[in-house]
Amino acid sequence: MKVLIVTAIYPTADSPAFGSYVRTQAESLKAAGIDVEMLVLKDRYRKLIYPKAILQLRRRLANSSVDLVHAHYGFVGMVARTQWKVPVVVTYHGSDILGWINSRGERERLGALIASGGRLLARCVDAAIVQSDEMAGKVHKSNVYVIPHEVDFKVFQPTERGQARTKLGLKPFKKYLLFAANPNVGVKRFPFAAAVAEYIAKQDPSVELLVACKETQERLALYMSACDALIFPSYQEGSPNIVKQAMACNLPMVSTDVGDVRQIIGSTKDCYVCNPSVPEFAARISEILAHRNRTDGREHIRHLESSAVAQKVIEVYEKVLRKQAGHAKARRPSFADLMNVLRPRDAHQAREAVERTNEN
């Protein structure tokens, strides 16, 4: 089986965290025996990325015996669905179905438009993969599959705390809280995390908030082993990779009730879901800091190991191809349907928002 993965997010030397989960999945699919080709969409003029991608995709399909196209994110899925030569699977990541949230926790109008386009697209592709039950509830049920992103257990594994701190140049006596996202992305809610850290530091001056942003996956894993707790106060998520990676490193955490966090942490000791209240977050983190133990989170997320998730994705591919072999016809959207949500101006704004959101 040959699969063409199409994406506008993919790690580079300058941005090693950008779309790292897409690369992880591509590598796990290859390891499982899938013949994977990549089409990474980019252009020096961002407004031209998606219109240009339509031609790039057609040329690639004309010159390759691809069985199926797997697109990451709704906008890329719209590009993929402008052709009907091969079936299309789209993985939605969160905001492309749920909409965008600003720094005040309010929904943005453009985000609502993009989410509407994503939901329309889900009815027109051969399969839609989403990250959580919440996302699944927003789209047509006949072809939706809940498959959260996997965790690379080889990279994200526990390292002795002192050893990790030495490698990162951190102080051995400090109590570090980790904020592992871009502080400039409003939905990640950095000011709240800073307020929680300040609240705790008034009673315990050894507490310090660390920000890990745009790090390589290997360094991020070290931060997770070096720190005492993850603070994750996001307004909205699909299935947050940071939470799953922290679980794989046995890092205690306190999170808002977003995406599938509650399901991920389950009954793991020293992992908490809290209301977005500074005193409540601070109280839970103080409990963690009182004994500074590690969790057994890694054992709770074995089902999210790369090989296990790859098999679930492959099962979707196989089901789609069997259906195609049976000559089942998908509903084709009108040209106007797709073009209305592929306008260059909106595509430009959407890509910028996706880039900001996916920086760790």
What are these regions (language model features)?
Residues 151-167, 324:
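Acidic anion/phosphate-binding donor-loop and adjacent secondary structure
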Residues 3, 68, 83-100, 128-129:
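Active-site proximal beta-strand in glycosyltransferases
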Residues 58-59, 108-127:
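Membrane-proximal helix-turn-helix segments that form the acceptor-binding/catalytic region
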Residues 252-255:
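Short hydrophobic beta-strand element within catalytic cores of glycosyltransferases
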Residues 4, 170-188, 194-197:
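Conserved donor-binding/catalytic core segment of Leloir-type glycosyltransferases
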Residues 122, 222-227:
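Short alpha-helical donor nucleotide-sugar binding micro-motif in glycosyltransferases
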Residues 235:
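Aromatic "clamp/platform" in nucleotide-sugar-dependent glycosyltransferases that forms part
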Residues 267-278, 286-291:
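Conserved acidic donor-binding segment of nucleotide-sugar-dependent glycosyltransferases
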